[in-house]
Amino acid sequence: MLVNSQDLSLSSYDYELDSKLIAQKPLNPRHDARLMVVSKDNGPNLCVSHLKVWNLLDELRAGDLLVINNTRVLKARLRVRLKSGAMAELLLLEPHGDGRWLCLAKPAKKFLPGDYVWMEALEQESLKLQVLTKDLETGGRIVQFPQEFSNRKSIENLLERYGEVPLPPYIRQHDPSDADRYQTRFASTPGSVAAPTAGLHLSDEILNALIQRGIEKASVTLHVGLGTFRPIEEEDLTNLKLHSEWVEVGEEVVSAVQACRSRGGRIFAVGTTTVRSLEASFLLGGGSMKAFQGLVDLVIKPGYQFGVVNGLLTNFHLPKSSLLLLVSALIGRERLLELYQEAIERKYRFFSYGDAMFITPEAVLPGAKSPRVLQ
């Protein structure tokens, strides 16, 4: 699939957005969010419908497969006290073994290697953490927790009790209810520091209705971290690299995809993290899905050919983000930016708590389909 130079320039993925369109809280019920359905007429033109997420029931059919990301967001933000007495914060990103964690520190310049910081939310005496080193790749800090927190489960318990939900910075006011509403209804595997936001739209009611209509469901796990939300800094995207994230695609997912293909069904990903998980499995299998677990740094941008995914439910993403690149790979950058402009004109709500877009198989660029898989 040919791409032009603009497709590989970060500035080509910019757009202007009125801050009033950045959703500050989700709708209730979840499935009441607006849904831009992108299909195609009998010719080359896209056909756009403006519906509600509940209408997803009318876009899917019996035999289709909906794949979700079952990761659960950790309360990964910790308030700590510096040796100066000032308060600061750590955002725990990923474990590095033996009680060591990669963290984003704020303000970073106050966290020097060798320093100690203290958590004071505990009933007992304050918990002392040591800053070991600066991580050159991320600009974060490797922080050592005490011996009693050397395994992941003990840290997860600590965060659940004393941590805070790490909402994106564009959500200005935090609410206690965010602990629930910033989780998908199927979040079951702790490990993310941001939600797979497309899944936030799927209420229990719509999930049950999908099952009743014969639409199959399968789950992957991708723990959302820097690879998803870290801003891209380089203008030339030719050799873009993303920070790796932990993924698990089980045998049951591989079987579900194969069964769906056999019966002539279509495979829809809920969110860009699910897309990356499925496509990583496809690439690792050399053109056939393979069950695996491990770190993935797959970059999907225009020119990529999809081997698994036929369609996508996704949110409206930040300018110049890796998520925008991924969706552009599916339907084309210029077409996507035109759709975003239409969404802005129609006052759609953007980003994590915002509205959604549903890309049907008909809207996918012909060149974006891998010749190795029957689409």
Curated annotation (Swiss-Prot):
Pathway: tRNA modification; tRNA-queuosine biosynthesis. It holds the Pfam family Queuosine_synth. SUPFAM superfamilies: QueA-like. One of its GO terms (molecular function) is S-adenosylmethionine:tRNA ribosyltransferase-isomerase activity. It comes from the Bacteria. It is an enzyme of class 2 (transferase). It is found in: Cytoplasm. GO terms for biological process: queuosine biosynthetic process; tRNA wobble guanine modification. Its EC number is 2.4.99.17. Keywords: Cytoplasm, Queuosine biosynthesis, S-adenosyl-L-methionine, Transferase. GO terms for cellular component: cytoplasm. It catalyses: 7-aminomethyl-7-carbaguanosine(34) in tRNA + S-adenosyl-L-methionine = epoxyqueuosine(34) in tRNA + adenine + L-methionine + 2 H(+). Its main location: cytoplasm. Coiled coil: none annotated. The keyword Transferase applies. Monomer. Belongs to the QueA family. PANTHER family: S-ADENOSYLMETHIONINE:TRNA RIBOSYLTRANSFERASE-ISOMERASE. NCBIfam families: PRK00147.1, queA. Transfers and isomerizes the ribose moiety from AdoMet to the 7-aminomethyl group of 7-deazaguanine (preQ1-tRNA) to give epoxyqueuosine (oQ-tRNA). This is S-adenosylmethionine:tRNA ribosyltransferase-isomerase. The gene is queA.
